[in-house]
Amino acid sequence: MASSMRSLFTDHSRYVESFRRFLSNSTEHQCMQEFMDKKLPGIIARIGDIKSEIKILSIGGGAGEIDLQILSKVQAQYPGVHIINEVVEPSAEQITKYKELVAKTSNLENIKFAWHKETSSEYQNRMMEKKELQRWDFIHMIQMLYYVKDIPATLKFFHSLLATNAKILIIIVSGASSWQKLWEKYGSRLPRNDLCQYVTSSDLTQMLDKLGIKYEYYDLLSTMDISDCFIDGNENGDLLWDFLTETCNFNTTAPPDLKAEIMKDLQKPEFSIKKEGKVLFNNSLSFIVVEA
């Protein structure tokens, strides 16, 4: 590995920008929206039974776009019921964006929001110091378990916080996606970091099975348009390269042979499909619903 290569997580602003480019070039949020519309109402059908208020915990809530979709479904299921929505999010920038989104969104009068600038581990430690743990009716962890050091312990802890009829929704890249193939083949040749680990739904279901925790599992197709990655000097492509490889300025710091290998693989059918002149990377998502 060339010494000039460094993890994308060493440059927070570059990471945030590459993540935004990923979202704008992928069907990630559309895929989540489809799940929220078609599956979520059935999943939350009993979480608020005989309750005067519903407590929701968002772990890694980001800028809040998906959180507000979830809240709208809960409101529709339990009209007029008071909702407490607490958000655990380590990025101050994301919390600011979340608050801005709430401020300009209507029909949130029956929801009380609270934000905690901390990681899930910091939240866990803070709660463990308290004598009485808060119980939750719905906990969701959207695309955040990659940033947890001890995933089984995290799953076990948050499962212990579930109230009667409560559920946890976990969204993570599918074991059938191209991310797993990319990580398995090239992970050892890309910069190491302590902040993120390669984990997919395949790993997660094994962990849940080992813990004896019951869950339901759904897979939905999502794609990322990586066509710009094959255009020299394209800024959008450069940022997508960074996101794909979790490497800061991958295009200018990666050894030419490594870049050529990955570029060749990304165009193969096992990684991407070619449609209407676009190269679409398999970004399929898994939705895992954990029961109390």
From Swiss-Prot:
One of its GO terms (molecular function) is histamine N-methyltransferase activity. The keyword Cytoplasm applies. S-adenosyl-L-methionine binds at residues 60, 89, 94, 120, 142. It holds the Pfam family Methyltransf_23. Signal peptide: none annotated. Substrate binds at residues 28, 283. Keywords: Cytoplasm, Methyltransferase, S-adenosyl-L-methionine, Transferase. It catalyses: histamine + S-adenosyl-L-methionine = N(tau)-methylhistamine + S-adenosyl-L-homocysteine + H(+). One of its GO terms (biological process) is histamine catabolic process. The keyword Iron-sulfur does not apply. Its EC number is 2.1.1.8. GO terms for cellular component: centrosome; cytoplasm; cytosol; nucleoplasm. It is found in: Cytoplasm. Monomer. Inactivates histamine by N-methylation. Plays an important role in degrading histamine and in regulating the airway response to histamine. Belongs to the class I-like SAM-binding methyltransferase superfamily. HNMT family. This is Histamine N-methyltransferase. It comes from Bos taurus (Bovine). The lineage of its organism: Eukaryota, Metazoa, Chordata, Craniata, Vertebrata.
